Amino acid sequence: MKKRIKELTDLLNRYRYDYYTKDAPSVSDSDYDKLYRELVTLEQSYPEYVLQDSPTQQVGGTILKGFEKYRHQYPLFSLQDAFSREELDAFDKRVKAEFPNATYLAELKIDGLSISLSYENGFLQVGATRGDGNIGENITENIKKIKDIPHQLSEPLTITVRGEAYMSRQSFKAINEARQENGETEFANPRNAAAGTLRQLDTAVVAKRQLATFLYQEASPTARNQQNEVLAELADLGFSVNPYYQLTSSMDEIWDFIKTIEAKRDQLAYDIDGVVIKVNSLAMQEELGFTVKAPRWAIAYKFPAEEKEAEILSVDWTVGRTGVVTPTANLTPVQLAGTTVSRATLHNVDYIAEKDIRIGDTVIVYKAGDIIPAVLNVVMSKRNQQEVMLIPKLCPSCGSELVHFEDEVALRCINPLCPSLIQRSLEHFASRDAMNITGLGPAIVEKLFLAGFVHDVADIYQLTKENFMQLDGIKEKSADKLLAAIEASKSNSAEKLLFGLGIRHIGSKVSRLILEVYGDISALLTAKEEEIARIDGLGSTIAQSLTQYFEQKTAAILVDELKTAGVNMHYSGQKVNSDAALFGLTVVLTGKLNQLNRNEAKDKLEALGAKVTGSVSKKTDLVIAGSDAGSKLEKAKSLGIRIEDEDWLRQL
């Protein structure tokens, strides 16, 4: 189970990167959801194997170059997904267990891009993207070009609101027609078009593309008591609010609303991919709280995927940076969710074997939420027995023999000198989440590798202007920019370097957790496995992988070469203080705080070494209870958990 959890974590994180960061989804929503739900089930059964970089512990995407970073005062969370009436009933049961009289507000789930708008004294100050939920991109100038976003509110309020920016189907059609006439690549769907538009550096382009918005939340403290009152206030302030919402008291009413909306979905002027159900009482919302990733007071019902038939013409096999060989099917073109689809993932050889997929087969292709599709299964009634599937025995890149380990689902090339493996490793090292070497993408990495200028990541820091000038298509100005980006990467905080090394199981968040404790890459050369395993959020698998990597002589040589080249080895963030007053404690906040707001209290607790969670359990060490604390306080008492008040926290 441990290995399957790791496989799912790695796969889903790659899909998340493609979806949130590149705005180029590589798997359908429905397929992603199926894998995600499998991971959730396994993690619930084996909580000791949950990895720090698991997508169940994360929110959103990563930060793109070109706009300033913006730290959200109020974090943006994702929503728990539901795909059936039974899952909605289970959500209702959990809520009603604490609040028997709870009512719900059902709203449309707009398929766009999450935005946050901050106003001071009624004037728009900042418009930002979600980013990773804590840090987004400041896109204020582009936000100001969206006609239905007020620059000044009808009242002089200081307020932060949330919503969705989207592109109407009519605008999307017009833009793609124009792009086709100009010989430009068409957008895959309205969501991608909206995302690309908001990241435009030319604000005139943003204005021309006619984005629109629906606002649905006050993130800052509000005087309203109910979610439907929040929507009414947002409309009064001049924001666009979606007119399709319904106050309900039962799941029967919600299910009727879902079916009504699903029936008229195609008649709407914009794309939706589901219905969001929220506890209407804001006081109940606060008491229910959050998981690491999502609020406990809301759930998103997602519509079933659209399905079409297509024929598999051929299969491409590509090698990733860890040696995993991934199959992609080339299909007869088919119209699916408004776009032409000609490629779909086949995941791995085990998936192909399980579904008995062959070249020449007619298959069911599905795509939820306008995302690039995957193959669901084979239409066996259309098979004529002439179909074949040739599973490669040799690496498509280097020609060495592929292996299929018993505990893995994929074929793997284990040749350390495989050109594709080396190139993917170099690309990973230069990528945004790693060393963020702007401009050093796959095309240039390939040219550098084929020219013999780079063989490992340390070689990047030995490149000269002359090296770049020898490459086809690289002019002096481009060479100067690349060298400047390489030089700038030397000053990155060490967790980016650790992630960039591409060690198995060591994601970006895990890298930060490790460096928060060790502070320096060099210290990892002698770190003990049992010490690493004790770091909160890690475990034996990560610890073993890290120590095995740094026990290699080649790792010590590589670190020395990078250090000699001037690459920073130190962690620039705040190191964990094991002497902090609440170090290692799991703490829950409940009730109304009078002096501190929730974020201030959470920040203080984390600064004192605590891990703040949203629910009380046997693993909880401490509960900070404000006034009007409800069921969480009672549960803490029943479990004999230590309870303190706000004054106690303020005095620490």
Swiss-Prot record:
Active-site annotation: K109
Keywords, ordered alphabetically: DNA damage, DNA repair, DNA replication, Ligase, Magnesium, Manganese, Metal-binding, NAD, Zinc
EC number(s) from the headed UniProt entry: 6.5.1.2
InterPro entries hit by this protein: BRCT_dom, BRCT_dom_sf, DisA/LigA_HHH, DNA_ligase, DNA_ligase_AS, DNA_ligase_CS, DNAligase_adenylation, DNAligase_N
GO terms, molecular function: DNA binding; DNA ligase (NAD+) activity; metal ion binding
Parts forming coiled coils: none
The family this protein is said to belong to: Belongs to the NAD-dependent DNA ligase family. LigA subfamily.
Function description: DNA ligase that catalyzes the formation of phosphodiester linkages between 5'-phosphoryl and 3'-hydroxyl groups in double-stranded DNA using NAD as a coenzyme and as the energy source for the reaction. It is essential for DNA replication and repair of damaged DNA.
Protein name (database record): DNA ligase
